[in-house]
Amino acid sequence: MSTHVDRKRITIPQIRSMKGKGSIVSLTAYTTPMAQMMDEFVDLIIVGDSTGMVAYGFNSTMSVTLDMMINHGAAVTRGVSKACVIVDMPFGSFQESPQQAYRNAARVLVETQAQGVKMEGGAELLETVDFLVRRGIPVMPHIGLTPQHANVQGGFKAQIRTEEEINAFIKLGRAFEEAGAFALLVEGAFEEAARKVTAAVTIPTVGIGASPECDGQVLVTEDILGLFSGYTPKFAKRYVDLSQPIKEAFSRYAHEVRSGEFPAMEHCFGVRKNSDGG
């Protein structure tokens, strides 16, 4: 069994200071083993509400609960000794009021030991971000394509196309910076919009389906590992196809159990070895 080693983790101020100094490397994680494996390679781990679709088979993120996010967030921080960890606030846990958002975000930080929260939305969140930051809770607003607003946005479609929309997007990014956000997650925005908002703010932008000009990139880990055999989003890159070796392992295990090959005596307790080592 592995044990967590408490070392110096990357801090929120350090993430903020990485603006313009090389790309911030970020991935999603929902479990301790995955967090342990990626920890040495990434700067920022996002415990995303995408877990609803990745781990639970939901059609969207709307069914994810605060308790689910806390459980996954705590699992991830137990596996991390270097990376900064941010936890998504799920739909319905922060939209009602700044006070509701504070209560739930404070619970997330206390119970998970994560370093900040991520919230999806637009100008309606400005007051909430200011309220939380003033009370010691680091916030990363998630702008552009926001999956929690898929019903309003008409599905998972790229956003911010026109000049008017781009100008409003830049204004929104600056407003979040003024409200105290430490970084912005920019998803599914047209490249020009993502590039221009990155240039317009002094806090880092982390892109997913956005622009190479963002200050960092994040992808869903299961997408880069090829764990979904049927679909890879346009903005994702599959670095390995693990679905096939995993299926092969399942196949070999099933065959050995059915054939009686597994377990062998070497896998059993209380069995003495023969004098010849057999």
UniProtKB/Swiss-Prot annotation:
Signal sequence extent: none
Keywords: Cytoplasm, Magnesium, Metal-binding, Pantothenate biosynthesis, Transferase
Pathway this chain belongs to: Cofactor biosynthesis; (R)-pantothenate biosynthesis; (R)-pantoate from 3-methyl-2-oxobutanoate: step 1/2
Cellular component aspect of the GO annotation: cytoplasm
GO process terms (BP): pantothenate biosynthetic process
Annotated catalysed reactions: 3-methyl-2-oxobutanoate + (6R)-5,10-methylene-5,6,7,8-tetrahydrofolate + H2O = 2-dehydropantoate + (6S)-5,6,7,8-tetrahydrofolate
Main location: cytoplasm
Highest taxon listed in the record's lineage: Bacteria
Binding site for 3-methyl-2-oxobutanoate: D49, S50, D88, K118
The keyword Metal-binding appears for this protein: yes
Family: Belongs to the PanB family.
Description of how the protein assembles with itself and partners: Homodecamer; pentamer of dimers.
Record protein name field: 3-methyl-2-oxobutanoate hydroxymethyltransferase 1
Gene name of the record: panB1
